[in-house]
Amino acid sequence: MAMTVSSGDTTAHLDVDRILSLFQLSKEQLHMVMCRLREEMERGLSRDTYQEAPVRMLPTFICSLPAGRVNGSFLALDLGGTNFQVLRVRFGSPCEGVKHVVSETYRISHELMQASGQQLFDYIVDCIARFLSNQNIKEPLSLGFTFSFPYKQIGLDQGILLNWTKGFNIPHCVGKDVVQLLREAIQRWQVPMGSHNS
């Protein structure tokens, strides 16, 4: 069975090809992009230029990766915008890797995004306490805290908030160690926790 192609289909196909061709880069153009990206990363690494560099290259203080030696259960916290997520991640043997993940997501209201730092971090710890209760977790677990805002990490478990994004506006937190703010809220709520890492 033969298919017929209308002139309208051919014209549309040519239009798509023409538009796609605008996004195809030559080897020379790709090399220019690579060089420019490298320049910007080097500016971000330099003590003299990192402050104004578009690609900030701040140290993470992570000196090595676990290499399969991690086992047991851990809490993972993720504050990334209008949602806050609490996860329990269970690692098995090196061969098994991640065995099980359970998570709950909590909404961050617009009002809370404009509230005080204490209110925000108290809410975060309230969510952690609810998660622990919902999952019937009684033992203290070590936790990792993903804080998806610009911050300067000054140690493995220390991070100074540079500025808020994503609609948050809590000036009191800017310039403060967000891990310490979390620790203080955990102490206020008396939630049993293991060690904390940002």
Predicted regions and their residues:
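N-terminal charged helix/coil linker that caps or initiates catalytic domains
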Residues: 1-75
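Short glycine-rich anion-binding loops that position phosphate/pyrophosphate groups of nucleotides
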Residues: 82, 148-152
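Short amphipathic alpha-helices and their capping/turn segments at secondary-structure boundaries
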Residues: 73-75, 121-140
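Gly/Thr-rich phosphate-binding beta-strand-loop-beta motif of the actin/hexokinase/Hsp70
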Residues: 2-4, 60-99, 142
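Glycine-rich phosphate-binding loop and adjoining helix at the ATP-binding site
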Residues: 103-125, 151-198
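Short helix-terminating capping/connector loops at secondary-structure junctions
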Residues: 69-70, 97-99, 134-141, 191-197
